[in-house]
Amino acid sequence: MNQLDALRQMTVVVADTGDIDAIKAYQPEDATTNPSLVLSASALPQYAPLIDEAIAYAKAKSNDKAQQLIDAEDKLAVNIGLEILKVVKGRISTEVDARYSYDTEKTIAKARKLIALYNEAGISNDRILIKIASTWQGIKAAEQLEKEGINCNLTLLFSQAQARACAEAGVYLISPFVGRILDWYKANSDKKEYAPAEDPGVVSVTSIYNYYKQHGYNTVVMGASFRNAGEITELAGCDRLTIAPALLKELQESEAPLVRKLEYKGEVKARPAPMTEAEFYWEHNQDPMAVEKLAEGIRKFAIDQEKLEAMLLAKF
């Protein structure tokens, strides 16, 4: 049995891509997108009609150019999601504009709009996850959205404080990053090579997984952002793992044995009192890696959102 099939027996495999052909090839349960993946998918020729349709939709909705652009980018993200939902049995994750990462109300409004666009296309809420950056404001937005029956995927998660706040807010799923944590440690320390078991990203996700299971939180842990297959195999047993096509291919081509690494069998402990905003910032800011990577991730997604807007504007 190849490693991908072995992994499927213990972990829900998710494709981290907007490329329909790649998704068809590996038959994941779910798929995740982000502004960077939407931007790269938009360059694929088969997506040209989706862009044209999004622009036509936006022009019909408003005469204001700025509003048309907002409507077109939202509709395009949903159009790509709709195509992906034709080939996955489970859920699509669609991300809120990263520029709203520190604005709870705008995040809630954008999430409701994206859900409405999916609903108009006949897709029920149980097939969608709204992706939101794991800022305090994003977590508070998700807490409200969950109460409305809108499930959320909290992304750009690098610290234990972020993970704890997400669980306490009752969010459906978190995406703790692995590879970007490794990147930071390689760039900021003398150690340049890590065995998979001691990879700081693997250690972080393992710690979060165990904390959730120890305290009986139902929030799904979906490891994300992988730099090599060793990080993935070291997290076998995690609730879900979202994996880029190149690494799905590598796993599929490997016949090496796969051992379950994550499985909590201990007793469930009492949960601590929920964190306050002050406690969240204090604990999160104790981790310079998490502070830098959260800010950088938001900036990068915002830059790609702006590139997407420029691409759309050129087609108006």
Swiss-Prot record:
Its main location: cytoplasm. It is found in: Cytoplasm. It holds the Pfam family TAL_FSA. One of its GO terms (cellular component) is cytosol. GO terms for biological process: carbohydrate metabolic process; pentose-phosphate shunt. InterPro entries: Aldolase_TIM, TAL/FSA, Transaldolase_1, Transaldolase_AS. It catalyses: D-sedoheptulose 7-phosphate + D-glyceraldehyde 3-phosphate = D-erythrose 4-phosphate + beta-D-fructose 6-phosphate. Pathway: Carbohydrate degradation; pentose phosphate pathway; D-glyceraldehyde 3-phosphate and beta-D-fructose 6-phosphate from D-ribose 5-phosphate and D-xylulose 5-phosphate (non-oxidative stage): step 2/3. One of its GO terms (molecular function) is transaldolase activity. It is an enzyme of class 2 (transferase). Its EC number is 2.2.1.2. It comes from the Bacteria. The active site is at K131 (schiff-base intermediate with substrate). Keywords: Cytoplasm, Pentose shunt, Schiff base, Transferase. Belongs to the transaldolase family. Type 1 subfamily. HAMAP family: Transaldolase_1. Homodimer. Transaldolase is important for the balance of metabolites in the pentose-phosphate pathway. This is Transaldolase. It comes from Glaesserella parasuis serovar 5 (strain SH0165).
